[in-house]
């Protein structure tokens, strides 16, 4: 169940209906800004419907926080973090510190001590390899059971392989009759 753009009572109501219909995979992202509400909704379901944490497969994504430059509809957003021009990224440990903070916030907001799947929301060009390497470390530490990527093309997966990094366990991407993504599926 995708949770964007659901918040507060609407999110709880949808989640209760979805749970009663058998939904168990819940998908969110830190830049949907609904992880706290989702945690409260899950807490409600645990207490009111007798569900357990283990009943759900929780997915979240590590994302950049965007701020608009000019007309956002023209695709002129720029990220706060994962750009070389960002002042935040000048520290040599910036990627590690940001990812550790993001996963810890996600776990706290969702009221859980682990995530079933953590995805990199986009292949951020300036820090793609570094982000993935830090995600591998967080996976090894046991905070997440699986790691993956979103919206990656073959060239991104080859870059990981060529650097000796692990291949993502999941690559979430859009596919439809009009947008078949045959190359990535074949890969």
Model-found features: residue ranges?
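Short helix-capping segments at alpha-helix termini
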Residues: 44-54, 110-112, 138-143, 163-167
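N-terminal binding-site loop/beta-alpha segment at the start of enzyme catalytic domains
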Residues: 1-60, 66, 70-76, 140
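Beta/alpha (TIM)-barrel catalytic core signal, keyed to glycine-rich beta->alpha loops juxtaposed to Asp/Glu
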Residues: 8-9, 104, 120-187
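Short, well-ordered amphipathic alpha-helices
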Residues: 36-47, 103-107, 135, 157
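Active-site mouth loops of central-metabolism enzymes
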Residues: 2-9, 64, 81-97, 126
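Glycine-rich, positively charged active-site loop/lid region within alpha/beta enzyme cores that binds
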Residues: 70-90, 178-187
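Hydrophobic faces of well-ordered beta-strands that scaffold small-molecule active sites
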Residues: 1-2, 26, 56-60, 115-120, ...
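CE4/NodB-like, metal-dependent polysaccharide N-deacetylase domain
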Residues: 97-119
